[in-house]
Amino acid sequence: PYGEDVSLGQRIAGPGTELFSAVRAAFPDLKIIVENDGLHPDVALLASACALSDMRVMQTSFDYCGSMPDAYPDRCICYSGTHDQDTLTGWLNRMSRVRKDALKACLNTEEEDVWALCDLCIRTLMDSACTDCIIPMQDWLHLDSHARINAPGTLGENWMWRMHEGQFHDQLERQMAQMSMASGRQSSENM
């Protein structure tokens, strides 16, 4: 209920396959993305049973499951993080040494520089089999927690971040294009 601590809430199962079968029958071309935070295995089962794309969020899947993008299925959309999560730089800066070492092992690197690790995370996501890959601009820019969009359950500074003129520059554009081409997500003809 409004005003209550969100941690006291509970998840209630919805109608499941019956609903999506009815929606698919009425709107056969409708594209639906299932929000899958990785915490409830039945969500992935529902997406699979209904041939729906679901999402994989690197921060969530690594934090809770130890799963990395190379294990993501092809019929999904991958994200480095969502509006409700920290930026990649913020996430990496808060990460314990043990967790960071585990991430580095998964990325097959000894790299310590946080910005370089951000770029490796982005490259790993882009190289995944996922049909689509969404990287928030804050992650491309290596911005820390101050550029976080939303901190659930808080008031005040949420939804305030804006990219400033000049933050997007030629070097970043080239980096994005090169990563997109190398991962097969953009052809050189589109550059």
Q: Can you name each region flagged by the protein language model?
A:
Residues 1-191:
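Active-site and adjacent substrate-binding regions of carbohydrate-active enzymes
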